[in-house]
Amino acid sequence: VWVMVGSLVDLAGKAGLGKAGPSGALSRLAGLPRSVFGTFLGHFGIGLTTLGIVVVSIFGTETVLSMKPGEKTGLAGYELAFDGLTPVEGPNFTELQGAFHLSDSSGQNFATLISSKRTYSARGMPTTEAGIETIGASQVYVSLGDKGPDGSIVVRIWWKPLVTLIWLGAVLMVIGAVF
């Protein structure tokens, strides 16, 4: 956070904010060399990326549980419900799709996640496609595991708060490098 604040303070200082008044600061800001903006964006991007990494590392969660259709689990103030499994035949694979829906604290559904486990017929190699939902700057990932004899399936759920800041920061660093 201090890198981002420092970048903002540095840019405001170079623009003369507080000395020249708002209109004078804007005209000074417009007259600054492009490299000043590149430096600002690069350092601000480093701060965003670092913030995203730290928050995900400290507050991110991973839950592994067995779920049957109709079962629900809590997730960072939301509720994730397992709707069921659907077999799908593709041109060169068979797939088991799991449907999940997310609801907020009032019970209102706002997202459907589809996760799947594929097996390709040529090699018999299984792969997993995660269901992903972005909520603000955070993301939920849902991945399917093995199916149980009782109709349940192992589900792995990740909550990654502020994970998109990692990518946003990287984009700002790239834009800053172009300046």
Language-model-detected regions and their locations in the chain:
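Solvent-exposed, non-transmembrane regions of integral membrane proteins
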Residues: 1-179
